[in-house]
Structure formats: structure tokens, C-alpha cells
Amino acid sequence: MIFQALAAADTPYQYGGQSHATGFDCSGLVAHVYRAAFGLVLPHNSRAQSKLGETIAREALQPGDLVFYNTQGQAYSHVGIYLGEDKFIHAPKPGSAVRIESMRGNYWTRRYNGARRIASL
């Protein structure tokens, strides 16, 4: 699964996108990775994804867990995939590309909403 996520690095952001060909938005990246790795069909919406699986405490995060942020003034408006060592991969915003970032940065720490582990894994 982490391989599929890392393979998306540097793919351009595209609202509504969920493939290497079209680009990715945040929830489209998550949906693509889970479909490619496990054959799971996840909703293409970060808030809907935030209701899947089980809640995970930040200190219990494992690679593959979903991490959620408030980036638009609403809880769970952004999602990424935890990679380990306080890093996650995500599709940040228009004009950017899929990239790895540290969860320790001030921007992400202040906006952290929680994490989920998809139960069927």
C-alpha cells in the first residue's frame, strides 16, 4: 500500500481527480491507493472517509492509516495517508502536486482532526 501511495508522488493536484492520468485531489488519492492496494472502494470525499474504520490515537498511528485535517474551516476537509515517522503523503491544493510532509509542522499540527484505520485491513 505504501508503494502505491509513494508512486503517486509528484502527480499534479486536480480537483475531482483520482488517477495518475487525471491527477489527484486529497480524497481521490486515498481512494486510488486503497483500490489499487486492496481492491477496496472508498468514497471520494474526505468527510465520508473520516467515518470509515476505527478511530486511532495519534501516538498509535501505523503506516496506511488515514490522517485528517481542517484546511477549509471545516473539520475533516483534508485527508492524507500516514507513512510513519510523523510523515504523511497527500494531494495538498491546486497548483501543487502529491507530496510527503511532516505532521510536526506548525500548520499541520494546528489543523489535525484525527486518524482512522480502515477496519477491513
Region spans (language model):
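Catalytic cysteine-centered active-site loop
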Residues: 11-63
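Aromatic- and glycine-rich peptidoglycan recognition patches
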Residues: 40, 56, 70, 76-77, ...
